Amino acid sequence: GKINNIPFFCTCGVGFDAFVSLKFADSGKRGLLTYLENTLHESLTYQPETYEIENEEGTVKYKAFLIACGNASQYRNNAYITPHSSLANGLIDITIMEPFTVLDVPSLSFQLFNKTLDQNSRIKTMRAKKIKIHRQHDGVMHFDGDPLMAGKELEVEIIPAGLQVIASPEKRSK
């Protein structure tokens, strides 16, 4: 897929995950522990934003903690943010995580790693070939976890069969 004409393979998005990606990139240290430290620290002060999401069917408005767009289902470390994404269906799966309380964290965390996040009442989902995300302020977005500052308007689209793989004849599946 592409977000603002930048290619991504698995996921892209805006909101908390993009913000943490930026903090993680600036931290100078790598690894799961550093990522978790950044996540916990930033979750104490992060403020959800209001977004409009426009697709082929119309426009919806959400106050969201994050919006994740998935071509594939997994963030990393077996966390499934768009659990029903498929690399083969030509569609982007969109997960909108609405604001939540500390009491929601255990179930959200369990469902994130159990491929059932879409069953949580704080989660809204949709599928589309292309979406536009409108937000009130410039901010960070991410593509496969790499942060980048971007404007108020974001465009996400899928590139059907966009990944070409070269393999030797004996390695090809039949």
Language-model segments: residues:
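Glycine-rich phosphate/pyrophosphate-binding beta-alpha loops
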Residues: 13, 17, 68-83, 147
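Glycine-rich, charged/polar anion/phosphate-binding loops
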Residues: 36-40, 49-56, 77-82, 117-119, ...
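A residue-level signal for conserved active-site and pocket-lining positions in enzyme catalytic cores
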Residues: 1, 20, 67, 94, ...
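Short beta-strand-to-turn element immediately C-terminal to the catalytic PLP-Schiff-base lysine
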Residues: 3, 21-23, 69, 97, ...
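Gly/Ser/Thr-rich active-site loops/lids in small-molecule metabolic enzymes
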Residues: 26-34, 83-103
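Catalytic core of DAGKc-family lipid kinases
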Residues: 1-65
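Short acidic/glycine-rich loop or secondary-structure boundary segments that cap or lie
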Residues: 17-20, 61-63, 75-78, 102-105
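ATP/nucleoside-binding phosphotransfer catalytic cores, i.e., glycine-rich phosphate-binding loops
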Residues: 55-57, 61, 86, 96-174
